[in-house]
Amino acid sequence: MFRGILDSVPDIDTIHIGPTAYASKVLDTDGNITATLVTAGSNRERVSYDQLPQDLVNAFVAIEDERFWQHSGIDLKSILRAVRGVVSDDDSAGGGSTITQQLIKNNVFGGGLHEGKFQRYVRKFQEQYLALEIENQPGLSKEEIKKSILTEYLNTINLGANTLGVKVAARRYFNKEVSELTLSECTVIASITKNPTALNPITHPEHNAERRAQVLKNMLEQGYIDLVENLLAVTRIEGGQVN
């Protein structure tokens, strides 16, 4: 059975792990943008890794995949924790998918929609296989691969109300460029991706605030921020910033 599952895995040389749908810009004869054309699933603008504030990168890693910089595509500790959560019916245990696996799920397997239970298990196994393949490509350093994965992930994710990717989210929620986001604003955006509808900071600010508290707690525990930065971010969040 496992041989058949592996035989049906997409070839790593033919897949594209990044998003393909982006908003289109209309320019005048002087090269100025006069309009932005957006269709369903394309309200996205590309951002490079160098344009991402470090707090945003750290916030997503802290809440989504704390061992991202260390693992090689899959995280056995997270998988075991997730299994224990399923067995004990503990929703707070979290999922077992790494950021790499989430990216593959979204851009290679179409988000895993309309799957039966068996198909879901097959897809999960194939995600893990591809994640290992992608993170262990020859000719690239571990850091280069990790930065590329994070860039594609942060350009891909659904951040509520047809807001795709962090660049559009920064404008949507804070009316600023992604590179200008503060720590507290970064945690607002990082909090959305788990459930873009229920955690939308405009329509469900109280739910987003609860998730943001967890993001900040994780960042503090993982050494990305100190206690003073944590307290300042909480204060700014409570003051209200979302447009």
Task: Say what each PLM segment does.
Residues 1-29, 239-243:
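N-terminal hydrophobic targeting segments that direct proteins to the cell envelope
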